[in-house]
Swiss-Prot record:
Keyword Isomerase in annotation: yes
Keyword Isomerase recorded: yes
Broad class of enzyme this protein falls into: isomerase
GO function terms (MF aspect): isomerase activity
Gene that this polypeptide is encoded by: fsa2
Annotated protein name in UniProt: Diels-Alderase fsa2
pH dependence: Optimum pH is 7.
Disrupted gene: phenotype observed: Results in the loss of production of equisetin and fusarisetin A.
Effect annotated for changing W216A: Abolishes enzyme activity
Region (Beta-barrel motif) residue spans: 216-374
Thermal properties of activity per the entry: Optimum temperature is 30 degrees Celsius.
Taxonomic lineage from the root: Eukaryota, Fungi, Dikarya, Ascomycota, Pezizomycotina
Alphabetically ordered keywords of this record: Isomerase
Similarity remark: Belongs to the Diels-Alderase family.
Amino acid sequence: MSNVTVSAFTVDKSISEEHVLPSSFIPGSGNIFPKFTSAIPKTAWELWYFDGISKDDKSSIVIGVTRNAEGLKHGGFKVQVFVIWADERTWHRDLFFPESVVSINESGVTDGIWKDATSNSSISFSCAGDLSKASLVFDVPGVVQGDMHLEALPGDTGLDTDARLGPSVYYVRPIGRASVKAQLSLYSSDATAAEQFSLGTSANGGMDRVWSPLSWPQVMTESYYLRTQVGPYAMQIMRIFPPAGSEDQPSTMARLYREGQLVCVAQHVVTREDALMTHDSLILSKQDNSDSEDVVTGGYRDKNTGYTVEFVEKGNEGQRWKFQVRHERIIWNTPTSRPGPDATGNTGFVEVLCGGTIGESYEGVGTGGQCELS
């Protein structure tokens, strides 16, 4: 019999009032198996995140699979499914499952299933031990059924770089650059038949693995996420601002690849005024082109229309890469505060980009997300 390690959670027994230490980060690994294996404390959370976007028609899919104490309110651990079609129609469900089981075998294959035995429904994922591929299966009758497949693109993985996002979060990209396919049947409450969603051969995306012993409000007050392919460049960004009153500095876990080669490893957030870059760094500034026609913004108080992204190689003669990011379509708007003129929220975007190093002007698309906590 093969050697299998299992982490089995039930929502009524696996959320702890006590302090629980996560297992250690494993350098060079995808760290896909849970870090809280027998119970998770109320402040902690774990996320398995998958996305894909078509460069041809800008259709996109985003999946978030979680373990955290939010499950107590809803009777299950959450899986979020977001879809946007080429015609900009969207579909979003937050689904909750009483059981969450993740296993890893002696070959390193990790399987996870979030399930509800009563309704005979589940959403599951599997990731190869060598991180060459991952897949998801959606089996929630009358809601969502289908599958999603990610295949790692050749080149550097970035797994041998620092995975810390500030002092309290680990942010790993087991499959940071992938070709993605998906075929889903999606049901709406007012529809008698399923709508079909297909993400074909022109789609790119990836898989992220994130965890922390602290809740998001304890970690940050604002964040921006981006994964994109722009000509020969692949870009991955997560940047957070610490809570008000914190002594922590803004943090990032940002990577830039060119033709599969990792060319900039940014853990530091800087400004253009910083004279000497002693580390690979990220400059991220908001754009406000609200006077232009057809601008897209989030649904809350932050009305930026996009970002300017600059990767800066360390040293006086370090190379720079600059990209303009424009919000093209909204995938979701989720509030993080009460309604009102000063309301905050979380918005997902289809992002359109252009840029490169000096003399380059490549174009591309990606998925982005910005969140502000009140």
